[in-house]
Each structure stands twice: as structure tokens, then as C-alpha cells.
From Swiss-Prot:
GO cellular component, one term: cytoplasm
Residues covered by region (Domain I): 1-63
Protein name: Holliday junction branch migration complex subunit RuvA
Family recorded in the similarity comment: Belongs to the RuvA family.
Protein source organism: Nocardia farcinica (strain IFM 10152)
Amino acid sequence: MIASVRGEVLEIALDHVVVEAAGVGYRLNATPSTLATLTRGAEARLYTAMIVREDSMTLYGFADTEARDLFGLLQTVSGVGPRLAMAVLAVLEPEALRKALAESNVAALTRVPGIGKRGAERMVVELRDKVNLVPVQAGPPGSTPAVAATPVREQVVEALTGLGFPLKQAEQALDTVLAEQPAADTSTALRAALSLLGKNR
């Protein structure tokens, strides 16, 4: 089991990062908030979770052990796999997720694409007591987000639809964000759009 990876950041994409450690490039799927803390060419440490399937081995990277442990905890809920768990952490930061579960806030959980009312209720019932067993841990201080290699609009819309938001809804949210922040880079625009979409659901 690979518990963490430390090394130079070779590539930052919309949903993953490549970190070179001991001459090996590791591809780690990550949330927008985690990717926003990384800088290409700088050294980074990410805590990891590995999902092994018959035909694949996938690494997921997190800024701290709290997010990694919550990722694992989410998957103990029936019907929640790695992709949906990552979508939850993309929309709700660890603190917000803890609060939503503790307060049985079904509405907050249904902001996540792919989670309906029943799924959110099941998540609350199964995790409300367990979530307090995951230690709270602050992540490392963030650094300057990477500069987008392609137009911001194209990248952000692709990322949002990849998380499960409808294309039209993603475009409308991004238009609102860019109207208010025309100079926003990809990471900033993506996080703002996610926040807006979460409020509107």
C-alpha cells in the first residue's frame, strides 16, 4: 500500500496530478481544492489511497490525512464508490462534510452530483457517528495555483461535467463567475463555480 508520495510536480491537469518520486511518475486523482495548492516544478507531498480493481490500480491524492480518511469512510456507504466519494470532497471540504453529517443536513449533501435525497439520508444514518472517529488535521499551507495551459472556460466546463453537472448548468455557473472575476485562473474559477452550483442545487 502506498500511503504517501513526495516529489516534484510534473503535471497538473483538471482532475489529477503527476508527481515524480524516485524516478517514477505517479498519477494521482485529486479534487480541485487539492490541485489548487500545487505548483508545477515544486516539491509536494500528497497522502494517498489506492483502489485496486481486476483491470486497474488507481491512486487518489489528498492534501492531508483527514481528507484521505474521509474518502475511505465515504466508500463504506452502500452505492458510494471512489468517483462519487471524490465528487463529495470536491463540493464539500472536510469541515463542511463533517458539519453536514453531524447536523443531518441532507440538502447540503444533495448538492453533490449523483447524490439524491435517499442517498444523502443513507449517508447521514451510516456516517453521522463514524465521522467523529476521523481525526481532524490541517493540511499544508497552499501555494500559487498552476497556470492554465488551455482556455479557462474549456477546462472548467470539462471539469464540472466530469464531476456530473449538466453541461448547460456548468456553463451558466461559469459565465456568472467569469462575469464577476474575468481574470480568474482555472483553479479559482472552478472552485467559485462549484460553490455557486452547490448553493443553487
